[in-house]
Amino acid sequence: PTRAEISDVANAVYDGTSAIMLSGETAAGKYPVKAVEVMAKIAERTEQSIHYDKRFRNFDFQIRNEIDAISHATCGMAIDIKAKGIAVCTLSGMTARMISRFRSPVDIVGLTTNEKTWRKLALSWGVTPIMVEEFDSTEVLFYTAKKTAKEVLGLEKDDRIVITGGYTNGTSGNTNLIKVERI
């Protein structure tokens, strides 16, 4: 990549973009694999220099609706209690994407039963999408979220996670709960 492309990648990451890709010329050039490796290294180093917890606290987010409020509260709670993860149970992916937009420094696991949602979440900043079976109760939702977050994030005994989602018998857009769980 050229210096300009390196600068563009770093600035895109700093500005909070969820995904980056090579330009056509670079991708079709002589060294596309090396270009991707360099781009990934630039992105990783740039992310390491960002203090996401300070950015979250200092930014004046506009809270327009309930899902914004729950997503913002989930991020704030995770930071405040030093949670090791956020588990989002989502049918449409909306709640996971809303949490992602706040750029929480806490890892996010997006649990979904919908393959289309799983694919979309793969492009959401900080979200690791996981396919799960449908929940038939909030107890199963909490158990699955806790178990999956432990496996995916490598959590240990006494680590805390924040779980959010909704139990609405298969309809999307009804996020209505936040819970803190200890592993």
Regions found by a protein language model. Give the residues of each.
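C-terminal helical cap(s) of enzyme catalytic domains, especially alpha/beta-barrels
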Residues: 26-48, 177-178
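Flexible, glycine/charged-enriched surface loops at secondary-structure junctions
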Residues: 23-24, 29, 48-58, 84, ...
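Phosphate-interacting basic helix/loop segments used at nucleotide- and nucleic-acid interfaces
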Residues: 69-83, 143-153, 159
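Nucleotide-binding motor/catalytic cores of P-loop/tubulin-like NTPases across gene-expression machines
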Residues: 95-97, 103-140
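Long, charged amphipathic helices and adjacent flexible linkers at domain junctions
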Residues: 39-74
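Conserved, mostly hydrophobic/aromatic
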Residues: 12, 99, 161
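Glycine-rich phosphate-binding active-site loops on the catalytic face of alpha/beta enzymes
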Residues: 9-32
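C-terminal binding/interaction regions
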Residues: 142, 150-164, 168-169, 175-181
